[in-house]
Regions:
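PLP-dependent amino-acid enzyme catalytic core
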Residues: 1-369
Length: 369
C-alpha cells in the first residue's frame, strides 16, 4: 500500500516518521493515502482500532501498542440521531485513536535512539500519550498549562509521566515541549501527522456501524483540529474508494471564547480572549497552528461551523447527563450546536445525524445539578 507524508505547504515529501514539520519550510506535514479502502480487508475478529490495521501500512503488525481502543458504541438517541461514545476509550477520550497509531509507528525508532517522548496538552492528549508511552516502555514528559484540570493532571501523573506546568498561553506550553533537548522526541498530537491520521479510524467505524450508509451530518467539537481533520480524511478515503456514495456534512462546533475556525470560515475577524474561562476546558486553541489546513479541508467537504454560548453548553451538558451520558463540557459543545441548529431551523430534526461525544465527564469538576 502506498502512502506519503508530505508538506501541507510546499509539497516536499518526508521519509522520517519521527518528523512533525517540513525540513524545508517548517510547515505542518500531512498524510497522503494512495490506496483504496476495501471492506474485505477489515480484520473482523478484532474489535479495536486495529480492526483496520491494513489501512495503516506504516505500522508493523508485531509493533502495535494497544489498550483496546476504538470500536466504541454508536448509540441511538432518537429516530434520526446517534451519539458516538468516544468517552469509552481506555483513557476516556478520542485521543487514544491517535496515540495508538503514533506510538505504534515510532516507539521502536525512539528506543533505538535511547530517547523519550515529549507532548504538550491541556489534558486529554497528555493522559492518552502518557498511557501509550508507558505501555510501550517509553518515558514521557508532558507539558501542561498551569491551570490544567485536576482530574486530568492526576491521570497523567498516574501513568508515571513527568509533568511540567507552564505559565502563559497554550502556545507557550507547545513552545516549551518543542524545545530541543538531548534524546527528547517531540510527538505533539496537534502537529504530528501520524496522530491525526489515526483519527480516521473513527470515520471507518461510524460508516461500518451504520452498514456503510453515511449520515447527513456529523457534529464534532473543535479546538486544535485533530478530530475534524482525521474524521474528514477518513470519510474522504471511503468516498474516494467508492465504499460510500458521498461524505457527510461535517459541522464543526466551537465556544464563543475559542472560535477561530468559525470566524475564519465565516470571514469574520476574531479577537481571542486574554484568558480562556469557558467551562469547555478542553477547547483552548485560540490560535491553532493548523487553522489554514482546517479551513481548507472544511471548505473542500462543504462543511459548516457553529458557535455556542456558555449557557447553551451547560444546558447541553445537563441534558446529556439526564439521558444517561456523562461527558465533559467540551463534548457537550457538539450536542449544544446540534440543538441550536434544530431550534433555529438551520437543520431538520429528521436529518440523520451523528454527534461525537469526545470525552468522559469523570474528568470534569463541573456537576450537572
Amino acid at each position: 500500500m502506498k502512502y506519503e507524508v508530505r508538506c501541507s505547504a510546499c509539497g516536499q515529501t518526508s521519509h522520517n516518521l519521527l518528523y512533525f514539520q517540513c525540513s524545508s519550510c517548517g510547515k505542518p506535514l500531512d498524510m497522503q493515502l494512495h490506496f483504496d479502502f476495501e471492506t474485505r480487508k477489515i480484520c473482523r475478529n478484532d474489535f479495536s482500532v486495529w480492526r483496520y490495521r491494513r489501512f495503516f501500512p506504516y505500522v508493523n503488525r508485531d509493533e502495535i501498542i494497544t489498550l483496546g481502543e476504538g470500536w466504541t458504541p454508536l448509540v441511538r438517541l432518537s429516530d434520526s440521531v446517534h451519539v458516538k461514545l468516544e468517552s469509552l476509550n481506555p483513557t476516556g477520550s478520542f485521543k487514544d485513536r491517535g496515540s495508538t497509531v503514533l506510538i505504534s509507528a515510532i516507539h521502536e525508532l525512539i528506543k533505538r535512539k535511547r530517547g523519550y517522548i515529549s507532548e504538550d496538552s491541556s489534558g486529554n492528549a497528555g493522559a492518552s500519550m502518557a498511557a501509550y508511552a508507558t505501555r510501550a516502555g517509553l518515558k514521557a514528559k508532558i507539558y501542561v498549562p498551569e491551570n490544567v484540570s485536576g482530574p486530568k493532571y492526576t491521570q497523567i501523573q498516574s501513568y508515571g509521566a513527568e509533568i511540567v506546568k507552564v505559565a502563559g498561553s497554550r502556545g507557550k506550553v507547545a513552545e516549551k515541549a518543542c524545545k530541543q533537548e538531548p534524546r527528547k522526541f517531540y510527538v505533539g498530537h496537534i502537529l504530528h501527522p501520524l496522530f491525526r491520521d489515526g483519527i480516521r479510524s473513527l470515520s471507518y467505524e461510524i460508516a461500518e456501524q451504520l452498514d456503510w450508509e453515511i449520515p447527513d451530518r456529523i457534529y464534532l467539537p473543535v479546538s486544535a483540529g485533530t478530530l475534524m481533520l482525521g474524521v474528514i480524511s477518513g470519510f474522504k478515503h471511503l468516498a474516494d474508494s467508492n465504499v460510500t456514495k458521498s461524505t457527510p456534512k461535517i459541522v464543526t462546533c466551537q465556544t464563543r471564547q475559542v472560535s477561530p475556525l468559525y470566524h475564519r470560515v465565516k470571514n469574520l475577524s476574531y479577537t481571542p480572549p486574554d484568558e480562556v474561562t469557558s467551562i469547555a476546558d478542553a477547547l483552548v486553541s485560540v490560535n491553532p497552528p493548523l487553522l489554514e489546513l482546517m479551513a481548507k479541508n472544511l471548505r473542500e467537504v462543504k462543511g459548516g461551523a457553529v458557535m455556542v454560548e456558555e449557557e447553551e453548553i451547560l444546558e447541553a451538558f445537563k441534558e446529556l447527563a439526564m439521558k444517561g451520558f456523562f461527558v465533559e463540557p467540551s463534548s457537550a459543545v457538539a450536542y449544544a450546536a446540534y440543538t441550536k441548529q434544530v431550534m433555529n431551523k438551520e437543520t431538520s430534526s429528521d436529518s440523520n445525524v451523528v454527534i461525537i461525544l469526545t470525552g468522559t465527564g469523570l474528568k470534569t469538576t463541573l456537576r450537572s445539578k
